[in-house]
Amino acid sequence: MVLSPTDKTNVKTAWGHVGAQAGEYGAEALERMFLSFPTTKTYFPHFDLSHGSAQVKAHGKKVGDALTQAVGHLDDLPGALSALSDLHAYKLRVDPVNFKLLSHCLLVTLALHHPQDFTPAVHASLDKFLSNVSTVLTSKYR
């Protein structure tokens, strides 16, 4: 899906509200994903997956940092996320459906923390953005 100029503005504005909490929200979304979709835990057998775990927080920061990088490169997501795509495709071998599950949990997390900013238009733009990120991260699986 191509992000329109309005989508790009919505994504940048919404992510601007996230700011320094990107890692925190990433960890919350991961925790929500593990609770809602227990099969996703199989990729983290070495993690302490309990609430507030330092390992989940650290991985949440990686997720938040990657999304912040992606927001900064909306016109070149494949270039910005190439190394991460390689990692997930060739080393970690994460089932592509898990990116959709995490995207959903990220949307829920953002809606909970920023209900006043989470309009239907912003929701749609963020959904398109996260879908594009998921597509890039799974592009090297083929």
From Swiss-Prot:
Q: Which GO terms describe its molecular function?
A: haptoglobin binding; heme binding; iron ion binding; organic acid binding; oxygen binding; oxygen carrier activity; peroxidase activity
Q: Which residues form the Globin domain?
A: 2-142
Q: Which GO terms describe its biological process?
A: hydrogen peroxide catabolic process
- Give expression by tissue: Red blood cells.
Q: Which InterPro entries does the annotation name?
A: Globin, Globin-like_sf, Globin/Proto, Hemoglobin_a-typ, Hemoglobin_oxygen_transport, Hemoglobin_pi
Q: Which residues carry this modification: Phosphotyrosine?
A: Y25
- Kindly state which keywords UniProt assigns to this record, in alphabetical order: Heme, Iron, Metal-binding, Oxygen transport, Phosphoprotein, Transport
- Annotated residues that bind O2 are located at H59
Intrachain disulfide bonds = none
Listed GO CC annotations: blood microparticle; haptoglobin-hemoglobin complex; hemoglobin complex
Q: Does the keyword Nucleotide-binding apply?
A: no
Instruction: List the PANTHER family.
Output: HEMOGLOBIN FAMILY MEMBER (PTHR11442), HEMOGLOBIN SUBUNIT ALPHA (PTHR11442:SF48)
Subunit structure of this chain's protein = Heterotetramer of two alpha chains and two beta chains.
Which residues are recorded as modified (N6-succinyllysine)? K8, K12, K41
Q: Which residues carry this modification: Phosphoserine?
A: S4, S36, S50, S103, S125, S139
Entry binding sites for heme b: H88
What residue stretch is flagged as signal peptide? none
Q: Which residues carry this modification: Phosphothreonine?
A: T9, T109, T135, T138
Which named protein is this?
A: Hemoglobin subunit alpha
Membership in a protein family: Belongs to the globin family.
What function does this protein fulfil?
Answer: Involved in oxygen transport from the lung to the various peripheral tissues.
Q: Which organism is it from?
A: Ceratotherium simum
